[in-house]
Amino acid sequence: MSSGNLRAGIFVATMTGLAEMCGEEIEDALGAAGIESDRHVMDGLDTNSLGDYNMLIIVSSTYGHGEIPDNGITLFEGLEAGVDLSGKSYALFALGDRTYADTFCAAGDRWDAVLSACGATRVVDIERHDASSGTLAEDVAGEWAARWAASFV
């Protein structure tokens, strides 16, 4: 897919705002690669918000016991109810903390499962950022997006 017909939507599920900072870095990396994108915090969004994009990029933290952040619940539940995303590609940047081994990046895994079940195709391995790794999530997010975005140009 060339960037000429690629329109990416970056959708952010966050509790503290860190995932939103990651989304900003991903948006910058895509722009540098020549890919048009729009970034949306998931507050109040439903599955209709996905329609304009053929590439979906989900940036999601995990909180509690592997839960989707509150602002992403409506969109997530809409996807769980079933929507046809065949023909759409997606990439996933998950935030978590390995000190919570049982639920590390569990929300990211849940997004992956629901997008796949709706017929979307993941185009790059899930990037799982570990809050206890000593790296800044937003730096890792930008570098991750820059690595694969070049292959779509």
Question: What are these regions, as identified by a protein language model?
Answer:
Residues 10-12:
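Non-catalytic terminal/interface segments that mediate subunit docking, oligomerization
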Residues 2-7, 17-21, 29-33, 40, ...:
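FMN-binding flavodoxin-like domain, especially the glycine-rich phosphate-binding loop
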